Amino acid sequence: MAENDAKPTLPKKSGPYISSVTSHGMNLVIRGIVLFFIGVFLALVLNLLQIQRNVTLFPPDVITSIFSSAWWVPPCCGTASAVIGLLYPCMDRHLGEPHKFKREWSSVMRCVAVFVGINHASAKVDFANNIQLSLTLAALSIGLWWTFDRSRSGFGLGVGIAFLATLVSQLLVYNGVYQYTSPDFLYVRSWLPCIFFAGGITMGNIGRQLAMYECKVIAEKSHED
């Protein structure tokens, strides 16, 4: 009996620690892949909406032919979506401000629907001038942030994403890498930043929701310890 009581106990923390690191890395990869395909899908859907006004971010035949001159645009949108979706929850943790506003999938789906609606409005509704279009889309985009986000980090990242994405797209156009199908370039520039801002908020909400599973696992392990 004494010998049995004297048996050394195995450390219990090494296993969960390794499991936690492994699950974190795997969770990160899975979230990135999911966000990538969501971004590609939304890029194709939004391009179909813009075709109604003959203003597209890439030629329409990119959907039917992988050998299109702008075949790389949807994968770039997917990559950007993955980066944005992973960046939002990372920024929340870094700032110590966990996002708790409307954290459920139904809210995320409504956010996606509103984002698609904003894009549809830019393609379908006829505005008197480009300034009216810009102000309307800006109000709708800020309304999307206020309704589904309301975080300072979300707003700041959205503005930064809109500025950077608009700058990159304009540089690509000026250098002839690709061009818009619409001759009215001022019209495109009037709605592009608002769409990028709303898209950043939308992908950020999706990324935050996907990250909730990992947060729940970490919380459960901390309670067990």
From Swiss-Prot:
Site (Required for the recognition of 25-hydroxycholesterol): F115
One Pfam family of this chain: INSIG
Lumenal side: 52-70, 127-129, 176-189
Keywords: Cholesterol metabolism, Endoplasmic reticulum, Lipid metabolism, Lipid-binding, Membrane, Steroid metabolism, Sterol metabolism, Transmembrane, Transmembrane helix
Molecular function as annotated in GO: oxysterol binding
Record's GO cellular component terms: endoplasmic reticulum; SREBP-SCAP-Insig complex
Short sequence motif KxHxx: positions: 219-225
Transmembrane segment boundaries: 29-51, 71-88, 104-126, 130-148, 154-175, 190-207
Lipid metabolism is among the record's keywords: yes
Membrane topology of this protein: Multi-pass membrane protein
Cell location: Endoplasmic reticulum membrane
UniProt keyword annotation of RNA-binding present: no
Biological process, per Gene Ontology: cellular response to insulin stimulus; cholesterol biosynthetic process; SREBP signaling pathway; SREBP-SCAP complex retention in endoplasmic reticulum
Cytoplasmic compartment spans: 1-28, 89-103, 149-153, 208-225
Family to which this protein belongs: Belongs to the INSIG family.
Job of this protein: Oxysterol-binding protein that mediates feedback control of cholesterol synthesis by controlling both endoplasmic reticulum to Golgi transport of SCAP and degradation of HMGCR. Acts as a negative regulator of cholesterol biosynthesis by mediating the retention of the SCAP-SREBP complex in the endoplasmic reticulum, thereby blocking the processing of sterol regulatory element-binding proteins (SREBPs).
Assembly: Interacts with SCAP; interaction is direct and only takes place in the presence of sterols; it prevents interaction between SCAP and the coat protein complex II (COPII). Associates with the SCAP-SREBP complex; association is mediated via its interaction with SCAP and only takes place in the presence of sterols.
Entry domain remark: Binds oxysterols in a pocket within their transmembrane domains and interacts with SCAP via transmembrane domains 3 and 4.
This protein's name: Insulin-induced gene 2 protein
